Design a protein with these regions (language model features):
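Short, cysteine/histidine-rich loop/knuckle motifs that typically chelate Zn2+
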Residues: 50-53, 92
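Histidine-centered nuclease catalytic patch
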Residues: 32, 54-88, 97
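Short Fe-S-cluster ligation motifs
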Residues: 82-94, 117-127
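Residue-level signal for secondary-structure boundary elements
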Residues: 27, 49, 98, 123-127
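Contiguous alpha-helical segments
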Residues: 1-51, 103-119
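Short Cys/His-centered divalent metal-binding micro-motifs
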Residues: 58-60, 86-114
């Protein structure tokens, strides 16, 4: 392993620890159940593409999140963060889904998520 690889691994591990701690605190503050292990979160943060849009995901470089930075989204926001109810998406997609759910309600947003997944899978087949 090169010095650059080691540095990159340490940087990613540090980002994952920070993300996990912040997510735990955020969920506790908002009264949302969080049932994912650190390893599960770390594996999800390795995602290369947004599950909703298919765009290439980036890793957070600081306290401000970029639109393409990876984050973990609950598929059904009425349920906890747990296996089967989470996916890796871009920060922008996560924010858009949250805003649309507030505007249109959960049923509309769940239909939109299904449609987005379908389009993303279809686009992947075309490549």
């Amino acid at each position: 392993m090169t010095q650059k690889d080691i540095s990159s691994t340490i940087k990613f591990d540090k980002m994952c620890v920070t993300y996990y701690a912040n997510k735990l605190k955020s969920c506790k503050d908002r009264g949302i159940e969080f049932n994912l292990t650190y390893t599960q979160v770390k594996n999800m943060l390795r995602a290369k593409r947004c599950q909703y849009t298919g765009i290439t995901l980036t890793k957070s470089q600081g306290s401000l999140q970029r639109p393409t930075d990876v984050t973990i989204e609950r598929i059904d926001s009425s349920k906890p963060y747990e296996t089967g109810n989470v996916c890796a998406v871009s920060f922008a997609a996560n924010q858009a889904m949250n805003n649309m759910e507030q505007w249109f309600g959960r049923n509309s947003i769940n239909a939109m998520k299904k449609m987005t997944k379908y389009v993303s899978k279809h686009n992947a087949k075309l490549k």
